[in-house]
UniProtKB/Swiss-Prot annotation:
EC number(s) recorded for this UniProt protein: 2.1.1.173, 2.1.1.264
Organism: Legionella pneumophila (strain Corby)
Alphabetized UniProt keyword annotations: Cytoplasm, Methyltransferase, RNA-binding, rRNA processing, S-adenosyl-L-methionine, Transferase
Lineage of origin: Bacteria, Pseudomonadati, Pseudomonadota, Gammaproteobacteria, Legionellales
Protein's name in the database: Ribosomal RNA large subunit methyltransferase K/L
Sequence similarity: Belongs to the methyltransferase superfamily. RlmKL family.
């Protein structure tokens, strides 16, 4: 008797899975992006459960039928002969996927299927199975699409990637079946048969090395667990199952060479050894604590296979370029005659290897699309893109410009007690970056390239930028941070891109300020407003200073150091806490200053306080959910300025600033107030190349201007 099956897999593995399943005896009827459909006898089903290295779940298709409505789903599930699958004393759980016009909630769909099963057994013998959502003996899958319900029984009960040997993993674990796919794409079974060695220099918890050992030693991955759901299946033949398990055990063979995993993290190596012991391959493998640059081959020929870090947070990719360059250098220098297979999601990092790939395969590490680069390490595969490689003509022009800017701006910065400044701002259009110096760090903000620029050209420019900046500016490669600067919209204002809590203290005149170069697109300090901040550093003691949309209140720090009494208003609690930290860093008594978490527009409407100096620097646009209304600075600047002017003492001054490049001040404001465009006076030396970085206006009441 043959059974209809659906075997699911990770995205991108369906055709590799098809080949594997055919080799195990499945008659394939259809391949889809979600997996493979086929027919198989009971012995073949058991072998699939024991031997598949790529599958996620093996589902026995029970029935399908038209079911647009709740009643139809219930009827199909009530009518099916469930006693042919399991008995009433088993525990069950339902996983429901899909929807119809009437069934839009998967929990509701699962409830209908469960009710149908329960009603069937009650009619049959008056008893019913119990529900156990955590660890059911019988897991039923129901899928509703285009008003067709398909119901299946999960023969194993869990995803087959859960081999049972990995109790703990590192920070970025690789699924066992994705690791197996990497090895199959790299032709590891064939290489192992020829006596090749294997080395994973980023082994983490050992998944790749363990999977490679199981393949080479012909160990069936399904042997490691004995809690498969098929033992509760009504048609299970335990004698046949045990016979096939015994045959699988008899096929295990010894290895001629040990497979090696190394990692710079000693703690993770201990975990890898424990995992290998649980997998039963500890005698076949060797795990050592070793940095990448110390890795050396133990055999003349072999396969280097690895899943290095590839940084999905903004800024991390660039941090990893030196690591990939070192990997390329180590492979080229020490592993001649070997093969290599390297998984990464970043084309920039792949190019940083400096080695030519023979083949590329798309794989998915979870939801993340990656490429597996397969290489032959030979003299013919010459190393490129090394840190000291000769510069192209364009890259040399960039080097010259950066060196010129550095020589000019470093002297100016030292003279003015400034440790953070802009050194480059797309001076050469083909290298569309802004580069800011923060102490001995460089933050590279890449302007999003136009769609007309081919991807390969943009990637080439990125690599050249990373090659040139450390040389020209004397910055260590590990202290380069890259972000992509694009037009910010709505909730993207001050976009958070990660969490490292890595803070750096910089100096600006008499003030010390905290910046975070990693976790946000912006660093906590708008460098272009430096001259405005230094202007506030000259306020008279006792001046009442309002900083609206205060961000991290760096302007207020300067004012407070001069003796001003500051009020700081912002909607973000995160930035207000950061502002308080800035004050503490400068030994400023917080009791003399206010930090108010408010929508600035609403606060200015209700406050009765008066101020001598107001700094109003709103975002160009914001639609934060916590705001009462959308903020559009071109549309709303008149009302904001009017509200701020109401809060001024008779002789007070409002400084209004915006970074909206195309900003136009409403002419009627000049009729109502004395308005002076002071933008040129607020552009410091490092922003002279980009005089439209912001607009700044000094606004006072007309009678005060006459005085």
């Amino acid at each position: 008797m043959n059974y209809s099956l659906f075997i699911s897999c990770s995205k991108g593995l369906e055709y590799l899975l098809e080949d594997e399943l055919k080799g195990l005896g499945l008659h394939v009827t259809q391949v889809s992006p979600q997996g493979v459909y086929g027919e198989a006898s009971l012995p073949v089903i058991y072998n699939l459960c024991l031997w598949s290295r790529l599958a996620n779940r093996i589902q026995l298709i029970l029935f399908s039928g038209h079911a647009a409505k709740e009643q139809a789903v219930h009827q199909l599930c009530t009518d099916f002969h469930w006693q042919t699958v399991f008995t009433h004393d088993k525990t069950i759980a339902i996983e429901f996927h899909g929807a119809s016009e009437q069934i839009r909630n998967t929990m509701f769909g699962a409830q209908i299927v469960k009710d149908g099963i329960v009603d069937h057994f009650r009619r049959l013998n008056g008893s019913r199975p119990s529900v156990d959502k955590e660890k059911p003996q019988i897991l039923i899958h129901a899928h509703l699409k285009n008003d067709i319900l398909t119901v299946s029984f999960d023969l194993v009960g869990y995803s087959l990637h859960q081999r049972g040997y990995r109790k703990k993993a590192g920070k970025a674990p690789l699924k066992e079946n994705v690791a197996a796919a990497m090895l199959l794409r790299a032709k590891w079974p064939e290489l192992a048969a020829q006596g090749y060695g294997l080395h994973d220099p980023f082994c983490g918890s050992g998944t790749l090395v363990i999977e490679a050992a199981m393949m080479a030693a012909h160990i069936a991955p399904g042997l490691l667990r004995q809690d498969q759901s098929l033992q509760y299946w009504a048609r299970h033949q335990s004698s046949l199952w045990e016979k096939l398990r015994t045959q699988a055990l008899q096929q295990v063979k010894p290895l001629a060479v040990k497979l090696v995993g190394t990692d710079a993290d000693g703690k993770i190596i201990t975990l890898a050894r424990s995992n290998a012991e649980r997998a039963g391959v500890l005698p076949l493998v060797e795990f050592n604590t070793l940095p990448l640059n110390a890795c050396r081959p133990g055999t003349k020929k072999g396969l280097v296979v690895c899943n290095p870090p590839y940084g999905e947070r903004l800024g991390e990719v660039t941090q990893l370029v030196p690591l990939y360059q070192q990997l390329g250098t180590t492979l080229h220098t020490c592993y001649q005659g070997w093969q290599a297979a390297i998984l990464t999601s970043s084309p920039v990092l792949a190019k940083a290897l400096g080695l030519r790939a023979d083949k590329q395969y798309t794989l998915y590490n979870g939801p993340l699309e990656c490429k597996l680069y397969c290489l032959t390490l030979s003299a013919a595969n010459k190393l490129k893109n090394t840190p000291n490689a000769p510069l192209s003509d364009n890259a040399q022009m960039l080097f010259n410009r950066l060196e010129k800017n550095r020589n000019h701006l470093q002297k100016w910065a030292r003279k003015n007690q400034i440790t953070c400044y802009r050194i480059y701002d797309a001076d050469l259009p083909e290298y569309a970056y802004a580069i800011d110096i923060y102490n001995d760090y460089a933050v590279l903000q890449e302007y999003a390239p136009p769609a007309s620029i081919p991807v390969h050209k943009a990637e080439k420019r990125s690599l050249e930028m990373l090659q040139v900046v450390p040389r020209a500016l004397g910055i260590h490669p590990e202290k380069l941070i890259v972000k992509q600067r694009k037009q910010q919209k709505g909730s993207e204002q001050y976009q958070k891109i990660g969490k490292t809590s890595q803070r750096l203290i910089v100096t600006e005149g008499k003030a010390k300020l905290i910046v975070n170069l990693y976790d946000y697109l912006d660093t906590g300090l708008f460098l272009d407003h430096r001259l405005m901040r230094l202007k506030f550093a000259q306020l008279e003691p006792g001046t009442r200073f309002l900083n609206c949309f205060c961000y991290t209140a760096s302007a207020s720090v300067h004012a407070a150091l001069a003796g001003a009494l500051t009020t700081n208003v912002d909607l973000s609690k995160t930035y207000l806490l950061w502002a308080e930290d800035n004050f503490r860093l400068n030994d400023i008594d917080l009791s003399k200053h206010q930090f108010l978490q408010y929508d600035c527009k609403e606060w200015m409407k209700i406050t009765r306080d008066k101020f001598d100096v107001i700094f109003l620097d709103p975002p160009s646009f914001s639609n934060s959910k916590r705001m009462s209304d959308i903020l559009d600075i071109q549309r709303d600047h008149v009302s904001l300025i009017n509200m701020a002017m109401r809060l001024l003492n008779p002789n007070g001054v409002l400084y209004f600033s915006t970074n909206l490049r195309q900003f136009k001040l409403e002419p009627m404001l000049k009729e109502k107030y004395a308005v002076q465009d002071i933008t040129p006076q607020t552009i410091d030396q490092d922003f002279k190349r980009n005089s439209k970085i912001h607009h700044c206006f000094k606004i006072v009441m007309p009678h005060f201007a006459d005085n």
